[in-house]
Regions:
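Short, small/polar-rich loop/turn modules that mediate ligand/substrate recognition or access, typified
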Residues: 174, 179, 233-235
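Alpha-helical segment proximal to the catalytic Tyr-Lys
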Residues: 128, 171-172, 231
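Active-site helix of classical SDR
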Residues: 123, 158, 166
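A conserved structural motif in NAD(P)-dependent oxidoreductases
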Residues: 207-218
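Conserved glycine-rich cofactor-binding loop
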Residues: 15-16
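Short C-terminal tail/terminal secondary-structure segment
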Residues: 146, 223, 234-246
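Substrate-binding pocket helix/loop in short-chain dehydrogenase/reductase
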Residues: 99-100, 107-109, 203
């Protein structure tokens, strides 16, 4: 299936976990892919090589998403390298949690910079290169709707902010043919949150299906939203969480 043939996609934080799965899935669907990474250069290279082996073009760009200038430069470089930009996936994020009194200014600033300001800055930069059929998709979290453990206030706040951003951008960019959506993954088996981790059984128990998601399952929803099949979906927050929020 080549639903994304001829499209160029940029995935922030695309070297690992859900971001890497999204990069690989969009490439499988026919897109050329640019991904950003902060530190995982080896993993980023592995993803790029996998994409190239499948016959698509790919590029990895080092960028700290907390620095707006670096993120904007990455967006512009992606568009310049491949001649266009059709799809932006805001995936990069930080997960800083703990008791309220233990979260200092540094943790708050880092969370706001990466989880809120970066998606907004990336959208600002990307939309300059997008035409009819452009797609902006952000990766949120199920805890934007259901925070089942204490200590999640800062992270939950940052992901909830994406709901407002998504709705506002969808209304603004709809007349330009650009859709904007938000995907809220539930517990997903990644190196940061493995399905065999110490609290995994408890976390999986909060889902209706009793298990973690595979990263590829989250990527499948992103691919649908990025394709023409998702053209009438905009301003939506979609829970891909195994019934965690049911």
């Amino acid at each position: 299936m080549n639903r994304l043939e001829g499209n160029v996609a940029l995935i922030t934080g695309g070297s690992r976990g859900i971001g890497a799965a999204v990069a690989l899935r969009l490439a499988e669907e026919g897109a050329d892919v640019v991904l950003t990474y902060e530190k995982s250069s080896e993993r980023a290279t592995e993803v790029v090589e996998q994409i190239k082996a499948g016959g698509r073009r790919a590029l990895a760009i080092q960028a700290d998403c907390a620095v707006p200038e670096a993120l904007t430069a990455a967006v512009d470089e992606a568009a310049a390298m491949f001649g266009r930009l059709d799809i932006l996936v805001n995936n990069a994020g930080v997960f800083l949690v703990g008791p309220l009194e233990d979260l200092g200014p540094a943790e708050v600033e880092r969370t706001l910079a990466v989880n809120i300001r970066a998606p907004f800055a990336a959208a600002q930069a990307a939309v300059r290169h997008m035409g009819q059929g452009g797609r902006i998709i952000s990766i949120g979290s199920n805890v934007a709707e259901r925070a089942v453990f204490p200590g999640l206030a800062l992270y939950s706040m940052s992901k909830t902010a994406l709901v407002g951003m998504t709705k506002g951008l969808a209304r603004e960019l709809g007349p330009r043919g650009v859709t904007v959506n938000l995907v809220h993954p539930g517990p997903t088996d990644t190196d940061a949150n493995p399905a065999d981790g110490p609290n995994a059984e408890t976390i999986a128990g909060f889902t209706a299906v009793g298990r973690y998601a595979e990263a590829a399952e989250i990527a499948a929803t992103v691919a649908h939203l990025a394709s023409a099949d998702g053209g009438y979906i905009t301003g939506a927050s979609i829970n891909v969480d195994g019934g965690f929020t049911a």
